[in-house]
UniProtKB/Swiss-Prot annotation:
The disulfide bond which can form in the large chain dimeric partners within the hexadecamer appears to be associated with oxidative stress and protein turnover. RuBisCO catalyzes two reactions: the carboxylation of D-ribulose 1,5-bisphosphate, the primary event in carbon dioxide fixation, as well as the oxidative fragmentation of the pentose substrate in the photorespiration process. Both reactions occur simultaneously and in competition at the same active site. One of its GO terms (biological process) is photorespiration. GO terms for cellular component: chloroplast. The modification N6-carboxylysine is found at residue 191. Its EC number is 4.1.1.39. Substrate binds at residues 113, 163, 167, 285, 317, 369. This is Ribulose bisphosphate carboxylase large chain. Signal peptide: none annotated. The modification N6,N6,N6-trimethyllysine is found at residue 4. Heterohexadecamer of 8 large chains and 8 small chains; disulfide-linked. The disulfide link is formed within the large subunit homodimers.
Amino acid sequence: VGFKAGVKDYKLTYYTPDYETKDTDILAAFRMTPQPGVPPEEAGAAVAAESSTGTWTTVWTDGLTSLDRYKGRCYHIEPVAGEENQYIAYVAYPLDLFEEGSVTNMFTSIVGNVFGFKALRALRLDDLRIPPAYSKTFQGPPHGIQVERDKLNKYGRPLLGCTIKPKLGLSAKNYGRAVYECLRGGLDFTKDDENVNSQPFMRWRDRFLFCAEAIYKAQPETGEIKGHYLNATAGTCEEMIKRAVFARELGVPIVMHDYLTGGFTANTSLAHYCRDNGLLLHIHRAMHAVIDRQKNHGIHFRVLAKALRMSGGDHIHSGTVVGKLEGERDITLGFVDLLRDDFIEKDRSRGIYFTQDWVSLPGVLPVASGGIHVWHMPALTEIFGDDSVLQFGGGTLGHPWGNAPGAVANRVALEACVQARNEGRDLAREGNEIIREPCKWSPELAAACEVWKEIKFEF
């Protein structure tokens, strides 16, 4: 075939409705809003081309490779019900296009260039199917849910956490004191805020030392294993690992990373270090809403969650369904299951476009955090189940009597909900009653119930 210069329609090469997807393909579901007058087939083909082998014009060097082997293919397009001029384009990518064990490379290919494309008004990556042939090239979470429970010796209930507030401005000593009080009161974990790194008012090394002191004081007093998510996020990967090494030397159980601002390369390095050195890894999703909040442009959080499970993390923030941050119940539970379970069936009502088989990749604990308090406990226990971390920042530290009583109130409320559920009671219907009963003998819980009885974040 002679080389023929010029510009030709993408759909001639990249729109292949009769393509049978392979088990090894990475599949993507894009929500496209084409510019007026651009047919959906051309738009879908353009997405497939620009995120794989294509460029805007025919090039001579195409003849030196096999496009059929390497090109992305738009294999199906369906209109979005109830939306004008919006379509779901399904694209299949051959596995050879991606470097093994690199979320960074996967995203650079699939979402790197195509979102600025002129033929599209908007584009959103709604879901990805990661084939086992690719997921097997990733270490994944350093430990996973079962190993974490075994390390902490905590079973049969959600774990309790608390973000230390005010997030910025405390000295290291006062910060450690707040950590101790929460852990002593009955929480399993306390947490550095995502923007606590190493600022002038509290350098990281001082914070690590005082938080370790708090842990080692609270553990013998409560007879429980405690942890504080020490945020190792830093300006360079080397500095981040240095902080993780110091945490390991202190003997603490868990460190933390902001995976989107820190970047997937840094996150994967840290996850490998954590597995090699027995540290749990808590992941915060700071910056996610910049990427995932728009309904028709960006990347849905379920894709960012899948990417995190591949890159590695033992906990990740995933919305609350009930607190101050946005999240719809079915959709949230869809990506919560994608984080925890081995095998998730396609279910469009939960936003899951593809059946996902993680094989043996460890699971991630979803963290519910943001504007939640004791009255939410029955709903949270019911929605998230045992394999979750419930994090009450203001809902602990805002207690009228202080941090430790705030922690007591949350632990009593949680234990009451778990017991009620195990006795077969209906948490959704009897939730308020289940919280009121222990108030009779727990003044801490009674005080918390009084303070937050009217608080709702309903918009």
